[in-house]
Amino acid sequence: MELEKTTEKLQKILIKALNICKDYHNPEICDEHMFKAYLDDDDIRKILSELKCDVNELINVTNNSLNSLPSNDSTNDPSISRYLYESYNEALKLSREKGDKYLGALDLFAVELFNDSSFTKLLRKHIKFNKKDLMDKINRVVSKSSLY
């Protein structure tokens, strides 16, 4: 991942996810860490609420999943999970197709929520919208601001 190709907002979320991963002593940064960081973000919480999503339920699912991840005592920096890496690349491609100079947090969030990891499949059982609904909402929000 190249942080210089991401917005400040996404950089903060990625750093927060890394710190969560380290706090839990997990060997790789994965969707659970990212979603813990995403769900702390007011803008993402607002979008989910507007889509009639129970954010607290998603937080509970995320926390439960985080607690079940393998941990180790290694002091090495964690690696990036395959699903996060693939989601990042797909979101970067999407942002370029839209003509964006930087990858924003909302685009990565949307792509990652609909990837094939077992965690995001579990999360999707707790939402009532599809990827198109989420992308439409994000595009309306992003058109008003370049901070995402």
In which residue ranges do the predicted regions lie?
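Histone-fold recognition with a strong bias for associated Lys/Arg-rich disordered tails
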Residues: 1-148
